[in-house]
UniProtKB/Swiss-Prot annotation:
NCBIfam families: ackA
Native source organism of the sequence: Nostoc sp. (strain PCC 7120 / SAG 25.82 / UTEX 2576)
Top-level EC class as recorded in UniProt: transferase
Protein name: Acetate kinase
Domain of life: Bacteria
Length: 405
């Protein structure tokens, strides 16, 4: 089975092609036959197309003009044309899987995409304005290029549909619940994959483990996982809640918003920009939303950069502590995504606060660019894993299961 994956972002569209045996799923993620990416510069009419294959062929082109959908269509054509050709024709693709950030209350599981599903994704765009419209662009590009090939939507919110009401419902008026205002949680595809991968690496039954997964990238979230299910998470109604992030504030006193909106120069649009684009590491440090650049500024004696680091660590530790309380204990702590996988300093700073649990980090393993391994000492009572998140492979697995039903 040939499975094409599209992973839409606000300024990029990533894609890859897997070949999966029809009779059984592989236990670990295979190397994709082909990987493509469209990056849009601030001038949305310019697209940087990057393609590589498992054989080592590469393509890098800049395309001017046309629509974003046309840019995605062009990227897809490189699957069956030119130096990066890996299939004879696009019709060889059996199914296309899409990461869709927000599925709302109605989409708890992966589904075959229909007109009704597309309309629901569009309707939920106000809750994920940077991602749901981009996912629709990818869906429509596939319809144009591949016709009636089955398409599957895999929702980032789906894994958190198991949250108990006490964790999911906000303590506002009950009318909010009736309006669908609740904690949805995000990064669910990553949290689910990493929890299953952790159990696989440790040779343990997933259902027997109490796991906290730390997805730390430009966006950051934690999940508390028990019996293989999400029972608590830090992101909420939108991906703005929870931890301090690259450019997002995370959780703040809502009274601050009321206070600012009473000032005539703070519109809803300005608040949306400030909280999503000008806060977090960027807002506090004044340097960047990128942690390595903040760390570089710290080495130069930048006070605000040091403050940003200290706040980031404080809120990460507090978040892990709250997830710990929801679980009633901890067997496995997982770090994943750009910061989680690459920053030994963040892992060390986070783990130092939980020595009282008997958690002991192996300094050498932590510093040695770990991938899919346990970096705790042999006598640590909590296993600490660094896992390379494989969202695309997780989506491909769900496509395989859905078509095999």
């Amino acid at each position: 089975m040939k499975v094409l994956i599209l992973n839409a972002g606000s300024s990029s569209q990533k894609s890859c092609l897997y070949e999966i045996p029809d009779d059984a799923l592989l236990s670990e993620a295979p190397q994709p036959l082909w990987e493509g990416k469209v990056n849009w510069t601030q001038d949305r009419s310019v697209a940087e197309i990057e393609v590589k294959t498992a054989r080592g062929e590469t393509l890098h082109e800049s395309i001017y003009g046309d629509s974003r959908q046309a840019h995605v269509t062009y990227m897809l054509y490189t699957l069956s044309r030119g130096a990066t050709k890996v299939i004879g024709q696009l019709s060889e693709i059996d199914v296309v899987g899409h990461r869709v950030v927000h599925g709302g209350q109605n989409y708890r599981h992966s589904v075959i995409i229909t007109e009704e599903v597309k309309q629901a994704i569009a309707k939920l765009s106000n809750l994920a304005p940077a991602h749901n419209p981009a996912a629709l662009e990818g869906i429509e590009a596939i319809e144009k290029s591949l016709g009636d090939v089955p398409q599957v939507a895999v929702f980032d919110t789906g894994f958190h549909a198991t949250l108990p009401d006490a964790a999911a419902i906000y303590p506002g008026p009950f009318e909010w619940v009736e309006q669908g205002i609740r904690r949805y949680g995000f990064h669910g595809i990553s949290h689910q994959y990493c929890s299953a991968r952790a159990a696989q690496i440790l040779g343990r039954d997933l259902a027997s483990l109490r796991i906290i997964t730390c997805h730390l990238g430009n966006g950051c979230s934690l999940a508390a996982i028990k019996n293989g299910r999400s029972i608590d998470t830090t992101m909420g109604f939108t991906p703005l809640d929870g931890l301090m992030m690259g450019s997002r504030s995370g959780a703040i006193d809502p009274g601050i918003i009321v206070h600012l909106m009473r000032q005539s120069d703070y519109s809803a649009e300005r608040l949306d920009y400030v909280l999503n684009k000008a806060s977090g590491l960027r807002g506090i440090s004044g340097v960047s939303s990128d942690l390595p650049q903040v760390i570089e500024a710290i080495t130069q004696g930048n006070y605000r950069a040091q403050l940003a680091w200290d706040m980031y660590v404080h809120r990460l530790r507090s978040g892990i502590g709250s997830m710990l309380a929801s679980l009633g204990g901890l067997d496995v702590l997982v770090f994943t995504a750009g910061v989680g996988e690459k920053s030994a300093g963040i892992r060390q700073a986070a783990c130092e606060a939980f020595g009282f649990l008997g958690l002991k980090l192996d300094p050498e393993k932590n510093q040695n660019k770990p991938v899919d391994i346990d970096i705790a000492t042999a006598d640590s009572t909590v296993r600490v894993l660094v896992i390379h998140t494989q969202e695309d492979w997780a989506i491909a697995q769900q496509c395989w299961h859905l078509l095999k039903r």
